[in-house]
């Protein structure tokens, strides 16, 4: 593997660890030329279904987009990065288990809302209010009442 510091192609693996849930492998490598160390991660290369937008456009699934949306909803909420990553993993597992080539964006949105509801009720309401395009306070009230039950 190419060294990110000097570009040398000769590096050696000095340590290998499997993640707790066995989803990826972490490797510490050392460059043979500059002797600097760096970390790489290996995870299976999977093909997620394409996301079909409301207007019919098809876009590729992007983990970063889900992460950004969830982080926005969870801003200043007491939820750890690990909890968010686990929620995204569950969303991705569900997407893959569907066994389809395309998923409507509203289905993905529902999966995100389900995970947010488990993590933090305030974040769930924040996300749902934007996702469902609330237009008046009564829609907020209905959702908050639903969450309180």
Curated annotation (Swiss-Prot):
This is Transcriptional repressor NrdR. Negatively regulates transcription of bacterial ribonucleotide reductase nrd genes and operons by binding to NrdR-boxes. Keywords: ATP-binding, DNA-binding, Metal-binding, Nucleotide-binding, Repressor, Transcription, Transcription regulation, Zinc, Zinc-finger. GO terms for molecular function: ATP binding; DNA binding; zinc ion binding. It comes from the Bacteria. The gene is nrdR. Its cofactor is Zn(2+). Residues 49-139 form the ATP-cone domain. Pfam families: ATP-cone, Zn_ribbon_NrdR.
């Amino acid at each position: 593997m190419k060294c990110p510091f000097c570009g040398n192609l000769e590096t050696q693996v000095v340590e290998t660890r499997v993640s707790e849930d066995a989803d990826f492998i972490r490797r510490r490598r050392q460059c043979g030329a500059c002797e600097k160390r760096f970390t790489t991660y290996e995870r299976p290369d999977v093909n997620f279904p394409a996301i079909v937008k409301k207007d019919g456009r098809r876009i590729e699934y992007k983990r970063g987009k889900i992460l950004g949306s969830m982080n926005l909803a969870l801003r200043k909420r007491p939820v750890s990065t690990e909890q968010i990553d686990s929620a995204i993993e569950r969303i991705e597992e569900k997407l893959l288990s569907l066994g389809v080539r395309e998923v409507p964006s509203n289905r993905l949105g529902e999966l995100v809302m389900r995970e947010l509801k488990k993590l933090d009720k305030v974040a769930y309401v924040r996300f749902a209010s934007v996702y469902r395009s609330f237009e008046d306070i009564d829609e907020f009230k209905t959702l908050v009442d639903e969450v309180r039950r």
